[in-house]
From Swiss-Prot:
It is found in: Mitochondrion inner membrane. The chain crosses the membrane at residues 16-36, 69-88, 112-132, 166-186, 204-224, 276-296. Keywords: Antiport, Lipid transport, Membrane, Mitochondrion, Mitochondrion inner membrane, Repeat, Transmembrane, Transmembrane helix, Transport. This is Mitochondrial 2-oxodicarboxylate carrier.
Amino acid sequence: MSASNVSLLHETSRQVAAGGSAGLVEICLMHPLDVVKTRFQVQRSVTDPQSYRTVRGSFQMIFRTEGLFGFYKGIIPPILAETPKRAVKFSTFELYKKFLGYMSLSPGLTFLIAGLGSGLTEAVVVNPFEVVKVGLQVNRNLFKEQPSTFAYARQIIKKEGLGFQGLNKGLTATLGRHGIFNMVYFGFYHNVKNIIPSSKDPTLEFLRKFGIGFVSGTMGSVFNIPFDVAKSRIQGPQPVPGEIKYRSCFKTMEMIYREEGILALYKGLVPKVMRLGPGGGVMLLVYEYTYAWLQENW
């Protein structure tokens, strides 16, 4: 193996390790908000006495009826997926950015397109895990009464298969969700980070990067949430058992808009921003500091 190939493999290994670490930390800290967000998105009416109206009320209801572990339903699939997912997220962003560097594009546009490409690639990897995660998150039974992650995955495969009606349903919505989020997330972060001067003070530099990452995650959440709502409806339980109402991404968006209004496409925005705002800052910081440490020590 040539020296250049060894160097590339070493660099990719650092990106995998740093990306996996960033994803694991973000998931463990922010997963309860992801559960609340999904519950908001799959409900179709607030007249149900078991409906979720506010973030605080949702936390209280889940804790009262499902216990503390109710906030961690569906956490195994994202944990299992985080290392490959974040490895794909960060390594493909760097790969696409390097490839686009050979073209006559402005740096700002390069960051946006590389982010879009990384999001689309990431979506293909993560979608089966998302199908399992959403199904577990919307289950209102006590944690000990619901099927295990692997049992539920086998159940989906047995009943619906591996295709676009089974373990890969909602792929188009997932492509939209991740593509748009990463385009805004990476595009805004790298463009603004290069504009705002860095600080020699470690604390101020930490706050600078966290602040930019926070805004990046918030903006990405606002722009991609209609795709997120459509994804939850397609991958979650259908209104009538045995009858598939939500099939394709854009038809699902149109149906939600027609039946529930434009604001329904933004259900779960508050818990999503509460998760991916600070989560976006945490993830980029963990990645950058872990990657810098690995460059010095490995």
